[in-house]
Amino acid sequence: MLDKVNTERFCLNQPQLPELPIPHDCMIKSALIENNCLVFTFEDDISGYDSIRCYKPEAKSLIIRYHLAHDKADIRIFKRQAAHGLFRRRESYKALEFREFSKLTERMEYLTHYLAYCSLIIELCAYDNISLRADVDHIEYEWIL
């Protein structure tokens, strides 16, 4: 039996920003760039998470496509570095290339996101905190039901 697909589109280039569902704590299986989009594919049985159960209880999986406003140079990725030194109070972030980032999906969790006009910040966790910033004009949530 084929799975049903329900697609929702959210525009970030409008005067009023949309309210996006946040797949908090959900595991990302893969991250790639295709057709000028950053694509996150989430694990199966995603409806077991509270953040999804209250929004789409019938969802089996989720694919999010972030359509880049210009090109893949619009994506900036930073990984938190451990603090070094005597007091270890400072934290720093190291810029990552996308190929380095795409290798971190073994235990990558989606934490939250922040929206602005044609701009998006996504906070992830893959053994360390990762901050992804991108210029995005629209986002598609493809729910696999």
State what each model feature region is.
Residues 1-145:
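Surface-exposed, interaction-prone regions used to assemble/regulate multi-protein complexes
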